[in-house]
Amino acid sequence: MADPKSAEDYYFAGIDFFGDGKLDEAIAEYNRALELDPKFADALHGLAQAYYARQDFDRVIEAAQRILALDPEDILAWTSISRAYQRKGMVPEAEEAGNKARILGWKQQLREQKSKGEGNS
């Protein structure tokens, strides 16, 4: 890949490294993307997944909390937190985060069903 210039370039490089199992390189690329765009949620998700694969669960939680600061209803961030807490043996916290993800998922389904119903009227 040519010298990446944009946050998206670094993000896609991170995806490539992650796919190749090069977790440290993926993390570095996601962090470069975030230096350029600290609110780049996809890069934060990638970072959380790379940390999860590396079994660095505290950093998974940290990355997911950064996502939630941008979007408190991000289902994947709540799921990432739940999985990390579970792996840390923090069952009540894992259940709480998992429940939050499920409730948000149900709300999303209801909104989608409602919008489909309105479109059929």
PLM ranges: what are they?
Residues R32-R54:
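Short, charge-rich amphipathic alpha-helical segments embedded
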Residues D3-E35:
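Alpha-helical segment of the N-proximal tetratricopeptide repeat
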